[in-house]
């Protein structure tokens, strides 16, 4: 009787294999290791099923397993943001362990339990060999129970089910295993990727069975929020195979796979195709990878741009919002790839731009507390340019004036832009000066210096001054944003700074009778301020004289704002804050400015400026 039962089982096993093989032809694809198959590694033994299964005398568990199991200890996936804990190991003989008996690379295919070592020719494709360090592979065989997290589908924990409407993506005994996503017997259920997936995974359908971008939990930010309408979900740009951004024909169809790899990812902690910003290179570095092509962002960094991080200061999603010692500027610091979008009409300042949807920022009121996600663009900039420690003057950005009125941390722009500041450009608050603004244009000028751009409004953005010199928003053809510019300090347009060998001495870079057009040395100021008004001395009687003599606005005016002028001899209206690298005191009289008398006292370019009879008298110094 026992012999008959075994024989019947063997017949059933072989019939099942035969029946499965006849479903759509060569359904097991490269898992058919027999000679003449499409697999890169083939063996001398006939019978495609027998490389994995044995009708009897195998390991003896449910799949009738025949391939020798790997007994390695694995280094599981981990990250600073994962809610899952513990040293997860795939249980020996269970689903994932069976897959790893070939795919960890420590046991050669063909090492069968029943038939011994089968002679094999060729080798497995390198992307299919995972090794024993699984930190760069999607987590599986988790320590149960699965820990809930805002980006996971609620049903995973509450019901032990995915949200896949087809039911193909499923938990295995309450856990995520290889067979949650892969069917080892059918290679082409997804006819494009042909990665033995349990279903078609175009448009991220397989990933979205477990990951929910729309879920909310009190007090927690979902990092996937915004995905549904994001540019990486909707972009119809065609991709080519050489781009290495997935198998599908468009960015939207590749979806998650445009940036992430479930196995052997180069950026392990986030399963990125490349480490940190390198994951963005495939699409955002120009070339023919996308059609139609998109602006080459990475070319901007070759100009004067935000510095790329070194290997020791990479971005981490769990890092402090205020970047102190670990200072860096990666794509992910300013952009959230899940929520980033593209629009043809921009919201009014100071609201964040669609390309920065979902990024974190810092509250301007204290410079420390989180605003996540940012509401206003400047909140994201303040992660580095606010109260953070470790800021330093970077020579690559060019000459930096030293102001007569300056706080202890002169690189902290928060007090400079503050509403309480005597005067400031209206970045973190609405324009509030009671003084007339005769030079202020109704609309900003585009890069050509002629056509009108955005309405001036009552607030401006950081990127109105710090932007690509060829940005699309103001009439160029390049990328928007402060990635890089040919002008110093990542300024959108040319702006020359007056410089002198010592305070009060001759300025060495004068621009007499300057070109006040878009090509001139002060083009940035002309974006918002009418040059003819300034040259008409409508707000100060010496404007035309100073400009025609070749002095820069920077000798007398600061760009961001004054901060507190308490205890100083400078009243601070109209951003008057002298560069003390250029000007010096006039004898014993400290550097001073009075808006009430519209006059100053200082020495500049070997000329003494002194208050006399309610006006400034300028005289050359005696030699």
Please identify what each model-predicted range represents.
Residues 1-9:
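Bacterial N-terminal signal peptides that target proteins for export
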Residues 17-21:
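Sec/Tat signal peptide C-region and signal peptidase I cleavage site
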Residues 22-623:
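A motif-centric signal for short, conserved binding hotspots located
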């Amino acid at each position: 009787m026992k012999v008959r039962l075994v024989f019947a089982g063997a017949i059933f096993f072989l019939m099942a294999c035969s029946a499965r093989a006849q479903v759509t032809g060569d359904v097991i694809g490269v898992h058919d290791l027999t000679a003449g198959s499409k697999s890169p590694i083939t063996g001398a033994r006939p019978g495609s099923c027998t490389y994995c299964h044995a009708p009897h005398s195998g390991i003896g568990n449910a799949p009738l397993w025949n391939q020798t199991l790997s007994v390695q200890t694995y280094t599981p996936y981990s990250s600073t943001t994962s809610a899952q804990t513990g040293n997860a190991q795939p249980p020996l003989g269970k689903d994932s362990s069976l897959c790893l008996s070939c795919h960890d690379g420590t046991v050669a295919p063909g090492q069968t339990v029943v038939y011994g070592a089968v002679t094999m020719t060729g080798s497995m494709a390198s992307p299919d060999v995972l090794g024993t360090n699984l930190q760069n592979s999607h987590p599986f065989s988790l320590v149960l129970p699965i820990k809930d997290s805002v980006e996971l589908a609620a049903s995973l924990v509450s019901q032990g089910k995915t949200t896949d409407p087809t039911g193909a993506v499923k938990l295995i005994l309450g856990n995520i295993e290889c067979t949650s996503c892969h069917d080892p017997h059918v290679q082409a259920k997804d006819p494009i990727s042909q990665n033995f997936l349990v279903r078609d995974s175009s448009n991220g359908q397989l990933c979205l069975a477990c990951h929910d971008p729309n879920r909310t939990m009190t007090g927690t930010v979902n990092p996937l929020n915004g995905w549904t309408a994001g540019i990486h979900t909707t972009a119809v740009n065609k991709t080519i195979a050489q781009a290495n951004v997935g198998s599908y024909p468009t960015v939207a169809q590749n979806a998650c796979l445009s940036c992430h790899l479930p196995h052997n990812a180069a950026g392990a902690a986030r399963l990125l195709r490349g480490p940190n910003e390198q994951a963005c290179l495939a699409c955002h570095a120009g070339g023919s990878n996308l059609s139609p092509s998109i602006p080459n962002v990475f070319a901007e960094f070759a100009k004067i741009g935000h510095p790329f991080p070194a290997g020791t200061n990479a971005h981490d999603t769990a890092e402090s919002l205020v970047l102190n010692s670990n200072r860096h500027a990666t794509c992910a610091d300013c952009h959230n790839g899940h929520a980033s979008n593209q629009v043809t009409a921009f919201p009014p300042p100071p609201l964040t731009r669609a390309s920065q949807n979902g990024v974190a920022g810092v509250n301007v009121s204290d410079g420390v507390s989180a605003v996540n996600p940012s509401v206003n663009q400047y909140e994201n900039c303040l992660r580095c340019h606010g109260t953070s420690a470790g800021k330093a003057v970077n020579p690559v950005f060019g000459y930096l004036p030293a102001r007569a009125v300056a706080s202890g941390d002169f690189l902290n722009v928060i007090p400079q832009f503050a509403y309480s500041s005597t005067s400031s450009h209206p970045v973190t608050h609405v324009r509030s000066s009671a003084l007339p603004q005769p030079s202020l244009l109704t609309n900003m000028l585009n890069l050509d210096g002629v056509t009108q751009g955005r309405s001036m409004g009552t607030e401006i953005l950081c990127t109105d001054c710090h932007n690509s010199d060829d940005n699309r928003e103001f009439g160029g053809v390049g990328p928007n944003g402060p990635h890089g510019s040919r002008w110093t300090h990542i300024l959108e347009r040319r702006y020359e700074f007056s410089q002198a060998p010592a305070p009060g001495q001759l300025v060495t870079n004068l621009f007499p009778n300057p070109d006040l057009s878009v090509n001139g040395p002060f083009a940035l100021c002309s974006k918002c301020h009418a040059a003819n008004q300034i040259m008409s001395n409508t707000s100060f009687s010496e404007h035309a004289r100073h400009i025609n003599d070749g002095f820069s606005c920077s000798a007398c005016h600061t760009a961001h704002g004054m901060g507190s002028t308490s205890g100083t001899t400078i009243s601070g209206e109209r951003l008057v804050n002298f560069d003390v690298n250029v000007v010096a005191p006039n004898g014993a009289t400290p550097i001073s400015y009075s808006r009430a008398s519209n006059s100053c006292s200082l020495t500049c370019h070997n000329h003494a400026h002194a208050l006399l009879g309610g006006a400034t008298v300028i005289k050359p110094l005696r030699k």
